[in-house]
């Protein structure tokens, strides 16, 4: 008896998910494998991927356009939360996983499957993200994880696939593993596993090199309403179009490359190369506008909670009660985040050079100026400093005896 009768497999067209199709059928006795591939704005032509799944033995090969919910329900909350895992990585890949898992569960219900499956390996982050999301949404569904159990190396998996008629998509000339969606690209494996090897220019596709970037700087303006980016240079765009334009502008000037050592959920460190030009640009602009419009104590608390929000998403806990509670805090703060941020793009840099808010700015020029218009009561400072420093003076006096 097989491990399941009908399985819906999260499918990308890569080595592991392609090999999963015959493996589930031949090794685990699954009667029927249905694949689901998500269109997340990666720009690939998905029809060849759909046909590849059928050639590999899938009974049905489904493709779903998830671009709009990906941006509206996942990217925009991440921008509002200034989500940067370990202060650097803007979660471009991690944000996609709970959405794919959600749709995977929906497809399983629609076709009457008794299990879902994915092709994540045993030491990656995505296995955690998929398993936890599916458990939260459909605890009754079995989750099959052949790539976690088959103990094949990447080379052995490619060879297994070739025996089953699946062509290898990776050559020795291109040994990289690449994940791509509208928010960015992640590149790993091959020579990049040596943390001292510089990434070759060939691995980048969304960003110009510093040498190829324009020599002339470009100033752009990004408008936010309730924490969401809504316009660039005065042109209002829908959320998907705005992300695309931010990618184009930032990428043209070589901004958005990351080369980092990252702490994975499973406890190991990995070397990751990311291209996330638009998302990083929008987070930087959003942070700056918050500095102008949020009260100091709210801003300090939000910066602390942002780190926890990013960690929860990275660790696969999108559907957790704590993440839901943090969303409530983030959303409440964003009603004040309205205004404009001006950024100068030049040779890999994105420097904030201006910010304004007609309705919510807490920058009062008469209080901040050192000129003749100064309305700050300097005499009040003496009493404030006395009270503020009282605990220190009492502590010092007690030490002296």
From Swiss-Prot:
- Which reaction(s) does the protein catalyse, per the Swiss-Prot or TrEMBL entry? L-citrulline + L-aspartate + ATP = 2-(N(omega)-L-arginino)succinate + AMP + diphosphate + H(+)
According to the UniProt record, which cysteines are disulfide-bonded? none
> Where along the chain is L-aspartate bound?
121, 125-126
A Pfam family this chain is assigned to = Arginosuc_synth
Any one of the GO CC terms: cytoplasm
**Which GO biological process annotations does it have?**
argininosuccinate metabolic process; L-arginine biosynthetic process; urea cycle
The record's annotation in InterPro entries points to: Arginosuc_syn_C, Arginosuc_syn_N, Arginosuc_synth, Arginosuc_synth_CS, Arginosuc_synth_type_1_subfam, AS_cat/multimer_dom_body, Rossmann-like_a/b/a_fold
Compartments in which it is found? Cytoplasm
Q: What terms describe the molecular function in GO for this protein?
A: argininosuccinate synthase activity; ATP binding
Q: Which residues bind L-citrulline?
A: 89, 125, 129, 177, 186, 262, 274
- Relate the assembly described in the record: Homotetramer.
The name under which this protein is listed is: Argininosuccinate synthase
Q: What is the lineage of its organism?
A: Bacteria, Bacillati, Cyanobacteriota, Cyanophyceae, Synechococcales
